[in-house]
A protein has these predicted regions:
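A detector for small-residue-rich transmembrane helices and their helix-helix packing motifs
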Residues: 1-133
Length: 133
């Protein structure tokens, strides 16, 4: 429950800050929280297999997590559909961080996978900083 609540807050806060200069932007729902729970499970069990509906091939969870973050970044940059990509992205960050805080030993167990999963977040932050400057 704590992962859900923190992911909900982080996802909504991220969306609020990302879209604060867009007066007509609106979003509702808890998909950022759900994304945080999913991303938390990906961090805890990176080798579990996940299947996407449009690609019925089992993928390791960490590959799914990386691809999902890249898709969210793409969706944010292109304003794709009526989907809260920013809330999903923020929720994933919240789920990742709270999981690492609650269970820090996972860092030793899966350091390289966690670094791979953090890479899209860092690339997004660098790109965002370049746009601001």
């Amino acid at each position: 429950l704590i992962i859900y609540i923190i992911s909900l807050y982080v996802g909504n806060y991220f969306a609020l800050k990302f879209h604060e200069k867009e007066p007509y932007y609106s979003a509702v729902g808890a998909s950022g929280a759900v994304t945080g729970v999913v991303y938390s499970s990906v961090v805890l069990y990176p080798e579990m297999k996940l299947i996407m509906l449009f690609l019925p091939i089992p993928l390791p969870a960490y590959i799914f997590g990386i691809c999902y973050l890249l898709y969210s970044i793409y969706g944010m940059n292109k304003n794709l559909g009526n989907i809260g990509h920013t809330a999903h992205f923020g929720g994933a960050i919240g789920g990742l961080l709270i999981t690492l805080i609650i269970k820090p030993e996972i860092i030793d167990e899966n350091l390289w996978i966690i670094l791979l999963m953090i890479t899209p977040i860092l690339l997004f932050a660098i790109n965002l900083k370049k746009k601001i400057i």
